[in-house]
């Protein structure tokens, strides 16, 4: 078996174009709700990838509850609490790249804020025409690689002689110690 893998075979089909932008919004007693919407005519997939939700300067020591409304896998809106922040015990939460597909609505349901939501906005372009053309190219490349692999099979036998056989490391045999109990 050859240790060389061509770069096109390892990569698989071409990945779609992804653009990344900084995302952030503020919720407070003045602005209780923020909606992230995209143009319906846009064929790209828009993802909001949240990183942190934190209380801002001037926040009171009260519970600030943030909830999010977004579509689920059946395209029905679902509302769930996202964070419960309090200045004295949890002023910030790291949500660890929590991805939500647009449209997304953030709402401050309790407290006066300010609450800052930050993360990234990813735009995944969908080019159906480019993908269909590249699939045909990939099939042609795979056929060429299969033809090349036949030539490499003869060389594989020579490579086995050069390599040393590696034996697994076995644990050392130690005598078991018995615990003596005195009562």
UniProtKB/Swiss-Prot annotation:
Residues 126-183 are annotated as: Disordered. InterPro entries: ARM-type_fold (IPR016024), Nucleoplasmin (IPR004301), Nucleoplasmin_core_dom (IPR024057), Nucleoplasmin_core_dom_sf (IPR036824). One of its GO terms (biological process) is chromatin remodeling. GO terms for cellular component: cytoplasm; nucleolus; nucleoplasm. GO terms for molecular function: chromatin binding; histone binding; RNA binding. Its main location: nucleus. Residues 126-166 have a biased composition (Acidic residues). Keywords: Nucleus. Pfam families: Nucleoplasmin (PF03066). SUPFAM superfamilies: ARM repeat (SSF48371), Nucleoplasmin-like core domain (SSF69203). It is found in: Nucleus, Nucleolus. Belongs to the nucleoplasmin family. PANTHER family: NUCLEOPLASMIN (PTHR22747), NUCLEOPLASMIN-3 (PTHR22747:SF13). This is Nucleoplasmin-like protein NO29. The lineage of its organism: Eukaryota, Metazoa, Chordata, Craniata, Vertebrata.
């Amino acid at each position: 078996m050859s240790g060389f893998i061509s770069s096109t075979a390892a990569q698989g089909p071409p990945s779609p174009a992804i653009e990344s932008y900084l995302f952030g919004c503020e919720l407070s007693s003045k602005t209780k709700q923020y909606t992230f919407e995209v143009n319906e005519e846009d064929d790209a997939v828009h993802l909001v990838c949240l990183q942190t939700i934190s209380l801002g300067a001037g926040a009171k020591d009260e519970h600030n509850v943030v909830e999010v409304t977004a579509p689920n896998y059946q395209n029905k809106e679902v509302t769930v609490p996202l964070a419960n922040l309090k200045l004295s015990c949890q002023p910030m939460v790291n949500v660890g790249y929590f991805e939500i597909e647009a449209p997304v609505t953030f709402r401050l349901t309790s407290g006066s804020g300010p609450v800052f939501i930050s993360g990234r906005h990813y735009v995944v372009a969908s080019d159906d025409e480019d993908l269909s053309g590249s699939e045909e190219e990939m099939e042609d490349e795979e056929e060429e690689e299969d033809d090349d692999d036949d030539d490499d099979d003869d060389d594989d036998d020579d490579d086995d002689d050069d390599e040393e056989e590696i034996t697994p490391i076995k644990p050392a045999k130690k005598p078991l110690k018995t615990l003596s109990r005195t009562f």
